[in-house]
Amino acid sequence: MEKVRLTAFVHGHVQGVGFRWWTTSQARELKLAGSASNLSDGRVCVVAEGPQTQCEELLRRLKENPSSYRRPGHVDTVIEQWGEPRDVEGFVER
């Protein structure tokens, strides 16, 4: 199974509502590595590495409206970028 790197910039009301914690929980459930970080402009940057199907599932959960996974906050838009994995380990909230 091919590994990929997903970088997702999540726009909306996603800071101060438990969004990074929720994202970390979802990524760990999907056995992905990476991080979820607040950006100074109010977005959250999610970086995930692992099998493409698992990264696509995380992206689907990030975008889904309304969320069937009890995602906190409100997501307006998710901008995604795909690339080569950098072999990070674990998933952390920054």
UniProtKB/Swiss-Prot annotation:
Q: Which family does it belong to?
A: Belongs to the acylphosphatase family.
Name assigned to this protein = Acylphosphatase
UniProt xrefs under NCBIfam families: PRK14422.1
The molecular function GO annotations come to: acylphosphatase activity
> Active-site positions, per UniProt?
20, 38
Per the UniProt entry, what species is this protein from, by scientific name? Corynebacterium glutamicum (strain ATCC 13032 / DSM 20300 / JCM 1318 / BCRC 11384 / CCUG 27702 / LMG 3730 / NBRC 12168 / NCIMB 10025 / NRRL B-2784 / 534)
Xref: InterPro entries: Acylphosphatase (IPR020456), Acylphosphatase-like_dom (IPR001792), Acylphosphatase-like_dom_sf (IPR036046), Acylphosphatase_CS (IPR017968)
Q: Which reaction does it catalyse?
A: an acyl phosphate + H2O = a carboxylate + phosphate + H(+)
Write the record's keywords in alphabetical order, separated by commas: Hydrolase
Residues covered by the Acylphosphatase-like domain: 5-94
- What are the annotated disulfide bridges? none
What EC number(s) is this enzyme filed under? 3.6.1.7
| Signal sequence range | none
Q: Which domain of life is it from?
A: Bacteria
